[in-house]
Amino acid sequence: MSRSAKPQNGRRRFLRDVVRTAGGLAAVGVALGLQQQTARASGVRLRPPGAINENAFASACVRCGQCVQACPYDTLKLATLASGLSAGTPYFVARDIPCEMCEDIPCAKVCPSGALDREIESIDDARMGLAVLVDQENCLNFQGLRCDVCYRECPKIDEAITLELERNTRTGKHARFLPTVHSDACTGCGKCEKVCVLEQPAIKVLPLSLAKGELGHHYRFGWLEGNNGKS
């Protein structure tokens, strides 16, 4: 074999290895992408009670899993690469197993890093997310039927979820009892989503960053105390 053939064979092997590596990485990327899409479709991932804001949480969490072990209801899971969250961090899916709102909040009390606020005194102060009625068109109560399951299952009934009466314009004779979520009381436990009788729940618990807007600091409301009458 001539000397000139050796470099050519080396280049061919190099290019072949590059193509194989690129193909392998692309396949892994596609697989992870599909897994993440499946994970998102199966339900929204929520953080445990007492979790600090998401960016700080991902940095503070040491992935020890103690909160998962402390949960007596197997609500909490640890995220994988396919979960759409930082791997090793705790989460739960309300449609699968909602938070049972333990009074002693064991998951937060064992957190060693501060990712979960151990100083939280009442589970009623937790804000794991916010229940949002995402599908009024299919909600049975909005159709004029009496369902009320989400309302009756809510651990803060008549506080976090109330039923508001509205005249049924379709019949002209009856009232509709419309479930209404109050963000100042909702803990985001997810029990309402869990018990929704529809194939896909009409009410879902979303992270606060998705469920609520954010008011700019330049807005002032004159009717609120401390604004000196300015609007």
From Swiss-Prot:
[4Fe-4S] cluster 1 binds at residues 61, 64, 67, 71. [4Fe-4S] cluster 3 binds at residues 139, 147, 150, 154. Gene3D superfamilies: 3.30.70.20. [4Fe-4S] cluster 4 binds at residues 186, 189, 192, 196. [4Fe-4S] cluster 2 binds at residues 99, 102, 107, 111. It holds the Pfam family Fer4_4. InterPro entries: 4Fe4S_Fe-S-bd (IPR017896), 4Fe4S_Fe_S_CS (IPR017900), MauM_NapG (IPR004494), RnfB_subfamily (IPR050294), TAT_signal (IPR006311). Its main location: periplasm. Its cofactor is [4Fe-4S] cluster. Disruption phenotype: Deletion of both napG and napH genes has little effect on the overall rate of nitrate reduction during growth in the glycerol/nitrate medium. However, during growth in the glucose/nitrate medium, the double mutant shows a decreased rate of electron transfer that correlates with decreased NapAB activity. The keyword Iron applies. This is Ferredoxin-type protein NapG. It comes from Escherichia coli (strain K12). The gene is napG.
